[in-house]
C-alpha cells in the first residue's frame, strides 16, 4: 500500500501540522505502508505536474495549516492542478484524509474545504483530523492527543485496506 502526503504549509519549525503528519507517517510505516511526502512550498514550480503522483497512491493525505484564513495558496494551487490535469478515473478510486491544524481559528472550515474539494474532484473522502494548536510542544506532554493522531492513521489504513464504500455526495 502507498500513501502520499501533500503538505501545504510553509514548513516552519513550530508548525503543528508537521508534528501531526510526522506522527501519522510513523504509524503508517509501522503498518508497512510506503509513504511519500510532497512539501508543496518546495515544489511551487512543479505543482501542475504533482497530480500525476496520485496515480501511484492508494490514498492521499492533504495536510495544511491555517495561520490566518483558508487552507493556503499552495494547497489551492495543488487542488486546481488536480481539477485541470489530474486523472479523474484514478482520483475517483483514491481515498483522501484531511489534516488541518490551526494556530488561530478555522480548522473545521479548512477540513471541510479539503473534503469538499476532494469530493467535487470525484475522490473518496475518509476521516481526518483537525484542531487548534497554538504551541506544538503541547503534543509532548499529552498522550491523549498522540493517541488521537495514531487512531486517525490506523483508521485511514483500515479504510483503504478494506476498500470501504462511501455513500455518494451531492456535490459530484
Locate the predicted segments by residue.
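Short, glycine-/small-residue-rich phosphate/pyrophosphate-handling segment
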Residues: 92-144
